[in-house]
């Protein structure tokens, strides 16, 4: 049996990237060069202003030893939590079977 724990307000995965770089003693500039992206791109992800794309997830997998799947799941969980927080503003009616 699989147990899934849902976080109500998960952090943006960029926070984990920033924490990981600090633990490793790697600057944002050095990490960006190693990832083959600009410093600004990495800064935007760490600051939570940009999402982790599948390509970025694969780059992180190669650089940090984590899996691309993990990064994408974290991003999806963050995005879904943000949407759920404003779900009441999305006006959708449930589909009902057509009366025959």
List PLM regions with ranges.
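Hydrophobic side chains within well-formed alpha-helices
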Residues: 13, 67-68
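A short, Lys/Arg-rich alpha-helix, primarily the initiator
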Residues: 2-26, 73
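Short alpha-helical DNA-recognition segment
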Residues: 26-44
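Short, charged recognition helix plus adjacent turn
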Residues: 70-100
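Short, basic-rich loop-to-helix N-cap that marks the start of a DNA-contacting helix
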Residues: 49-62
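Residues within the alpha-helical elements of helix-turn-helix
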Residues: 23, 34, 63
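The DNA-recognition helices of helix-turn-helix-type DNA-binding domains
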Residues: 38, 49, 64, 75-78
């Amino acid at each position: 049996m699989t147990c899934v724990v849902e976080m109500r307000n998960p952090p943006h995965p960029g926070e984990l990237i920033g924490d990981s770089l600090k633990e490793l003693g790697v600057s944002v500039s050095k990490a960006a060069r190693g990832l083959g992206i600009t410093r600004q791109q990495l800064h935007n992800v760490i600051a939570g202003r940009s999402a982790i794309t599948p390509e970025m997830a694969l780059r992180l997998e190669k650089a940090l030893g984590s899996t691309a799947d993990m990064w994408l799941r974290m991003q999806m969980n963050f995005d879904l939590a943000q949407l759920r927080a404003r779900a009441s503003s999305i006006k959708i009616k449930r589909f009902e079977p057509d009366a025959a």
